[in-house]
């Protein structure tokens, strides 16, 4: 039998590891090496191809555990092979566990898939870093399926499949205690009354510590507790929150010494479901913290190494990642600020996925467990001990797993503390159960300096910094909180400080997968008396940000500087525009930082490293927090001058918007940049500007900027250009004159704030300095002050200065080489173009459109009256043109009396700069009408500038104006000569456009042949073959009555419903009274079932009935739909009667189909039970299986499960030419050939495989309910009166016959159900576990596989016979040849 067993050895497919029957795992999940993307794809495709080659008739479901939010790479690969791939999370907030709800879902789906048949394979896969969750889910599945019962042994067995270092690499903490706790929940599913356990609200009364640890040689510790979990008061929101946090500055926090035998700490916290209980040791300053860990490993604190991180190894934060951070800010969901839980900011216990991350970011507390003992601060250790518990709380039982921490035998200075047991008391809201004794779980994890934090299924463990080191850069581990802010800062675990008056070092952001995505800088006030203000650190090498990087805006508790206090710097207009949605509805308080949702706020705290180059902040200063974006690389930000990283908005004083930027240059247009895309002009560089002049005018409101910046720039830049690309130059349209604005008064500009420092346009994105205010507007009768001369135009090869000073407001410079006549200076350019010009760039430049005058963008056109006092009026009085806009929409200005507008500005870019031109301006035309408040009063675009006095040219950039310009072209003004030609009937031939050489058409093209073409009389042709033109007068005469008739029709029903109803009535083609009479007579010969369904769909509703009843006019004037509804309203309960008619039409067909299916079930059950041949085949399979399994636990079987039939095809012989199914056919053909045709006894097997008992039950229920409704309608229609007598009579006859059919059908249905159950019992199966559909499908698959194997055996036998005959013939030939050789002498 050993040889027989070796002959039929079942080898798992290549690339897979067999766990148990039909459950496999990809073998590369157990490897410590990470495959490259190309190698990984090739490996997966190879495994999939091997599976399909060897198991072509099987189905595969792959459960993948990964860390990606989107679809995994294995999903895209295996989906091409028709395999089902289910992506599951590989962790929960960094913990190698999933929520109990998710665990239950995975287990149920896996069990359902495996129970469908033996041809279903379940393959498990995990991505890099997710091996602990894969091991846990495999152990849970094996326990759930009942194959294993011991949780510890099952989990150990799976972890032993991989190297020990694999778990240490992927998890800095030992996950086994927490995983064992949840495995016990799975194993207890048959013991507890309900599973999964319901999450019931309880009250955590107190925590009792029976062992007090010694921290830092003080003989005890100062514990505080934090509890995380879903809020039981908000059942709809299952997001984990801080349910309880011990206030740091209160009488509750006290020091407990080891002399205390028992410590009881009252909590009184309402909890529900998965809960994390965190114990933290507080330092003497009541600010710094140490995480308390109960473990059975060596006693080591969670101190981290104080060696600084090499900043040269860090890389900058990409522009795309910064855009993701900005997108996160724009979609934050804030917590409810009224709840106490919003005062606490939970932080997530980060876990690294590689040793490289651990070495690079030692500030992460969870990563310190991988540090070697040489890197740890052992001098401060003295028998330290700590605790962290995870609870799954229900009102039935409490299971808590904890581990005990012993002293470090190498560095302990006191006697060894004996291991003690911890007790936690959990009570419901009113009833308090007895305390639960916690038994320690000891799990040894080699090569780690500390052990497990118990991880929950629905929350995370916050991280507290533990090393009191000096800050470096902009991040500090802990700062003492001022007394005034202690209440709001009680739940914070770490803070951040901004260095002042020191040369800072570059900011390094940890590229960890678990860091949160927030950046906030807030510094305390320099002096205690004034309120706290925001100080933006003047850091030059710290925060270099790209030109195209957008600025993040966060609302903080601060007060904007007053006008007397100049600000440090100003944010860019683009930042203000993106900031508007954030700062519009936020409170100007630092409390907003404490309201972030857990997925952002519960971030890994970043602990600062020591640095001698920075000053530590006094303890009176308020602690600030630094949030680091999650899963983003480090971001070095460079700037040669002061850079404002955060744009701040408060409610106490409005934010100061940026002042007006300098005007555009004639051939240099700067476009707004978007995340790394740089666009600029390609012709010239920026011209040098003038020295600073008077301060700018009062700025406009920020909403004016934010509401119009995008609409105005959308007409300038249609799409962002990649770096290095040169866009096609657009045709420069002629500039329009400025719109008129009445000048009523002029107020001098207010004293502006201190202008910001100049920033090189090639490195940073702040707005360039603003120009001085424009001169006061010109009022008739008022002297005009002299206008300063314009600056010289920029030379083509001139370079722009590095730092442009604020320029004066010059008129638009001319194109180089153009000669012009001197005119008064035009007004300053529009706000939009100023904003556009404030984004300098270094990439190639494009030829710009001409600079429009002021007030031409939607920025100002939306609020024209906001700058009345700052506009410049021209000295000439031409008529005012209408107001227009360069954006996609036009906002009209309020009507006002005519005012002297400006003359048209000069054309720019009309020809090459080298060509000299003379442009003369026309005299002022006569005054025109004032502008109207309508966007439709836009005149067409002027295209030509002549010396004659034309009207003031105005234009728009819409398609309508382009079509208008085309209509005024010379071609459009020609007389249409062909308009009077009579249209002729076309000849629909196939046109030959090119005559081939030697063809008839080539000969026709010759001159001699062309002269032979006869002349065509066009007039005769038109008289004979013209298209008949209808007489317009007759057409109008014919249309008048129809229009009048249409106007007379009264439509009360919805137009779309009325049209659909008329379409339905046209299909019926029957008068409405006859239709209703057939319905009352239950006559199914006139209307079919589909038409009746349409009639039911168009039954009038109650509202429509009330509308028609309220109509008092002539009902003949109603539409067809209204008249149809009126006709249906004459029949009482018309919709119910129509449904009865539909049921009557379909009743016989439904009964016949249902009877046929029920009879098939009875027949197939009888055939299977009475088949003797099938019984002999099953007995042969049993003997064959016992022979294979002799001497094993599977041997000596008295029977086998039905799904074992499908495994016969899976076991292959060693030569891979024969399976156990082929061997069975061979044995039966040799020993029992009479049973080979047993499939002929099972004729109803295939029809029965198409039947679903659930569908039959639904059909039976529909028939039963339909008969009940018929009976109710019969009772009700008896009282309807004489109009329903025929209906009542016909319905009574139908009901009598239908009830008889229903009774016989119910009896047949009951019999078929018993037959289906008896078929499962015949094979020893439970009808609930193995329903009728599974039994029939398994038998049918076995029969087809048996027939295919038997046919293959017959073909193989034929081939062997032919081969034997050929061998025999060869032997005969050889024998004859041998005889001839012997006969020769």
Swiss-Prot record:
Molecular function terms from GO: phosphoprotein phosphatase activity
Residue span, FH2 domain: 974-1372
Keywords of the record: Hydrolase, Protein phosphatase
Every Phosphatase tensin-type domain range: 9-193
PROSITE patterns with a match to the protein in the record: C2_TENSIN, FH2, PPASE_TENSIN
Region (Disordered) residue spans: 345-367, 427-510, 649-989, 1362-1385
Database matches in InterPro entries: FH2_Formin (IPR015425), FH2_Formin_sf (IPR042201), Formin_homology_domain (IPR051144), Prot-tyrosine_phosphatase-like (IPR029021), Tensin_C2-dom (IPR014020)
Signal peptide stretch: none
Ranges of Low complexity composition bias in the record: 702-718, 855-867, 933-942
Ion transport listed as a keyword: no
Compositional bias annotation for Pro residues: 654-665, 689-701, 727-758, 766-795, 802-815, 895-906, 921-932
SUPFAM superfamilies recorded: (Phosphotyrosine protein) phosphatases II (SSF52799), Formin homology 2 domain (FH2 domain) (SSF101447)
Biased composition (Polar residues): 349-358, 448-470, 483-510
Domain C2 tensin-type: 199-358
Record's keyword annotation contains Hydrolase: yes
Active site annotation, chain numbering: 126
Family: Belongs to the formin-like family. Class-II subfamily.
PANTHER family (alphabetical): FORMIN-J, FORMIN-LIKE PROTEIN 7
Protein name listed in UniProt: Formin-like protein 7
Recorded name of the encoding gene: FH7
């Amino acid at each position: 039998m050993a040889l027989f067993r070796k002959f039929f050895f079942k080898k798992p497919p290549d690339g897979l590891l067999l766990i148990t029957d039909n459950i496999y795992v990809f073998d590369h999940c157990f490897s410590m090496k990470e495959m490259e993307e190309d190698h990984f794809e090739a490996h997966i495709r190879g495994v999939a191809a091997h599976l399909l080659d060897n198991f072509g008739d099987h189905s595969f479901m792959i459960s993948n555990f990964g860390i990606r939010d989107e679809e995994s790479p294995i999903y895209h690969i295996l989906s091409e092979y028709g395999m089902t791939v289910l992506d599951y999370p590989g962790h929960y907030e960094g913990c190698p566990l999933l929520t109990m709800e998710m665990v239950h879902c995975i287990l149920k789906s896996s069990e359902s898939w495996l129970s469908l048949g033996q041809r279903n394979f379940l393959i498990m896969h995990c991505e890099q870093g997710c091996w602990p969750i894969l091991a846990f889910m495999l152990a849970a599945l094996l326990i759930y399926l009942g194959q294993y019962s011991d949780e510890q042994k099952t989990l150990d067995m799976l972890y032993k499949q991989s190297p020990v270092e694999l778990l240490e690499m992927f998890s800095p903490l030992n996950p086994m205690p927490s995983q064992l706790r949840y495995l016990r929940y799975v194993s207890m599913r048959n013991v507890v009354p309900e599973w999964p356990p319901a999450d019931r609200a309880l009250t955590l009364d107190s925590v009792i510590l029976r062992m007090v640890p010694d921290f830092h040689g003080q003989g005890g510790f100062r514990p505080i507790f934090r509890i995380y979990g879903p809020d039981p008061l908000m059942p709809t929101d299952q997001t984990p929150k801080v349910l309880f946090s011990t206030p740091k500055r209160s009488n509750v926090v006290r020091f407990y010494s080891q002399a205390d035998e028992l410590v009881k700490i009252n909590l009184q916290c309402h909890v529900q479901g998965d809960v994390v209980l965190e114990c933290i040791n507080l330092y003497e300053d009541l600010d710094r913290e140490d995480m308390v860990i109960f473990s059975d490993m060596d006693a080591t604190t969670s101190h981290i190494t104080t060696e600084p991180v090499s900043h040269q190894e860090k890389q900058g934060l990409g522009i795309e990642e910064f855009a993701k951070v900005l997108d996160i800010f724009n979609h934050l969901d804030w917590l409810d600020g009224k709840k106490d839980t919003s005062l606490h900011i939970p932080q997530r216990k980060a876990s690294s996925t590689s040793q490289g991350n651990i070495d690079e970011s030692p500030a992460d507390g969870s990563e310190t467990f991988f540090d070697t003992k040489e890197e740890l601060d052992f001098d401060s250790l003295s028998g330290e001990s700590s605790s962290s518990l995870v609870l799954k709380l229900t009102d039935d039982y409490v299971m808590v797993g904890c581990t005990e921490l012993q002293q470090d035998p190498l560095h302990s200075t006191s006697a060894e503390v004996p291991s003690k047991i911890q007790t936690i008391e959990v009570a419901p809201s009113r009833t308090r159960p007895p305390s639960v004794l916690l038994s320690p779980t000891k799990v040894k994890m080699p090569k780690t300096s500390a052990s497990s934090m118990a991880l929950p299924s629905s929350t995370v463990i916050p991280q507290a910094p533990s090393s009191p080191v000096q800050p470096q850069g902009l991040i500090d581990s802990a700062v003492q909180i001022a007394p005034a802010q202690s209440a709001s800062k009680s739940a914070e675990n770490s803070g951040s400080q901004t260095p002042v008056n020191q040369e800072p070092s570059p900011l390094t952001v940890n590229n960890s997968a678990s860091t949160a995505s927030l950046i906030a800088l807030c510094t305390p006030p320099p002096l205690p008396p004034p309120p706290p203000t925001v100080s933006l650190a003047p850091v030059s090498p710290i925060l270099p940000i790209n030109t195209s990087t957008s600025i993040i805006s966060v609302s903080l508790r601060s007060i904007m500087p007053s006008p007397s206090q100049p600000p440090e710097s100003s944010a860019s207009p683009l930042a203000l525009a993106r900031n508007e949605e954030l700062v519009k509805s936020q409170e100007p308080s630092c409390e907003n930082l404490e309201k972030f949702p857990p997925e952002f706020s519960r971030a890994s705290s970043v602990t600062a490293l020591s640095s001698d180059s920075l000053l530590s902040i006094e303890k009176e200063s308020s602690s600030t927090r630094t949030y680091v974006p999650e899963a983003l690389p480090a971001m070095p930000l460079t700037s040669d001058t002061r850079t404002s990283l955060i744009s701040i908005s408060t409610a106490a004083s409005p934010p100061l918007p940026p002042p007006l930027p300098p005007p555009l240059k004639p051939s240099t247009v700067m476009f707004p940049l978007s995340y790394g895309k740089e666009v600029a002009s390609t012709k010239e560089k920026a011209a040098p500007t003038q020295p600073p002049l008077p301060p700018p005018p009062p700025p406009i409101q920020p909403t004016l900027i934010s509401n119009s910046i995008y609409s105005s720039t959308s007409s300038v830049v249609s799409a962002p250009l990649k770096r290095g690309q040169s866009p096609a130059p657009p045709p420069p349209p002629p500039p329009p004159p400025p719109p008129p604005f009445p000048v009523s008064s002029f107020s001098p500009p207010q004293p502006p704030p201190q202008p910001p420092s100049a920033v090189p346009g090639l490195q940073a994105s702040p707005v360039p300095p603003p120009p001085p205010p424009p001169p006061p507007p010109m009022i008739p009768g008022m002297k005009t002050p002299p206008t300063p001369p314009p600056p010289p135009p920029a030379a083509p090869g001139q370079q722009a200065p590095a730092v442009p000073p604020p320029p004066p407001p010059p008129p638009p410079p001319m194109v180089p080489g153009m000669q012009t006549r001197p005119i008064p200076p035009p007004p300053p350019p529009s706000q939009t173009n100023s904003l556009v010009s404030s984004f300098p760039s270094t990439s190639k430049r494009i030829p710009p459109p001409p600079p429009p005058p002021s007030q031409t963008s939607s920025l100002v056109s939306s609020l024209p009256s906001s700058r009345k006092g700052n506009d410049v009026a021209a000295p000439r009085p031409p008529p005012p043109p209408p107001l227009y806009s360069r954006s996609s929409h036009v906002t009209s200005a309020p009507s006002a009396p005519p005012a002297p507008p400006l003359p048209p500005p000069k054309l720019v870019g009309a020809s090459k700069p080298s060509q000299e031109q003379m442009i003369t301006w026309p005299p002022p035309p006569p005054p025109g009408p004032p502008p109207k408040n309508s966007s439709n009063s836009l005149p067409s675009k002027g295209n030509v500038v002549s010396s004659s006095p034309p009207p003031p040219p105005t234009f728009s950039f819409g398609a309508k104006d382009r079509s208008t310009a085309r209509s005024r072209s010379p071609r459009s003004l020609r007389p249409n000569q062909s308009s009077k030609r009579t249209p002729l009937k076309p000849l629909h031939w196939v046109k030959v456009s090119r005559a081939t050489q030697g063809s008839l058409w080539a000969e026709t093209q010759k001159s001699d042949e062309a002269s032979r073409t006869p002349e065509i009389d066009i007039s005769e042709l038109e008289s004979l073959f013209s298209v008949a033109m209808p007489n317009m007068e007759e057409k109008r005469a014919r249309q008048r009555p129809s229009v009048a008739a249409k106007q007379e029709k009264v439509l009360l029903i919805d137009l779309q419903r009325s049209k659909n109803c008329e379409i339905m009535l046209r299909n019926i083609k029957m008068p409405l009274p006859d239709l209703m009479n057939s319905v009352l007579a239950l006559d199914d010969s006139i209307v079919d079932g589909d038409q009746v369904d349409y009639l039911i769909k168009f039954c009038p509703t109650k509202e429509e009935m009330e509308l028609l009843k309220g109509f008092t006019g002539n009902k003949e004037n109603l539409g067809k739909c209204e008249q149809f509804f009126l006709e249906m309203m004459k029949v009482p309960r018309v919709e119910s009667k129509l449904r009865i008619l539909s049921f009557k039409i379909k009743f016989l067909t439904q009964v016949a189909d249902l009877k046929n299916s029920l009879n098939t079930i009875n027949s197939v059950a009888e055939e299977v039970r009475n088949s003797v041949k099938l019984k002999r085949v099953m007995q042969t399979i049993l003997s064959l299986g016992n022979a294979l399994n002799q001497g094993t636990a599977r041997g000596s079987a008295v029977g086998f499960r039905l799904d074992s039939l499908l495994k016969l095809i899976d076991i292959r012989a060693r030569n891979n030419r024969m399976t156990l199914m082929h061997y069975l056919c061979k044995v039966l053909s040799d020993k029992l050939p009479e049973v080979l045709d047993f499939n002929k006894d099972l004729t109803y097997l295939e029809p029965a495989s198409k039947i679903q008992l659930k569908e039959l039950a639904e059909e039976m229920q529909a028939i039963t309910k339909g008969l009940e409704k018929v009976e109710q309608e019969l009772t009700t229609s008896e009282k309807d009166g004489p109009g329903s007598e025929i209906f009542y009579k016909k319905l009574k006859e139908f009901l009598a016959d239908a009830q008889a059919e229903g009774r016989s059908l119910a009896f047949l249905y009951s019999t078929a159900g018993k037959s289906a159950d008896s078929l499962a019992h015949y094979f020893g199966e439970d009808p609930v576990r193995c329903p009728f559909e599974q039994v029939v499908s398994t038998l049918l698959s076995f029969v087809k596989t048996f027939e295919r194997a038997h046919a293959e055996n017959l073909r193989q036998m034929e081939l062997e016979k032919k081969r034997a005959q050929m061998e025999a013939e060869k032997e005969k030939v050889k024998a004859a040849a041998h005889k001839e050789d012997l006969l020769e002498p």
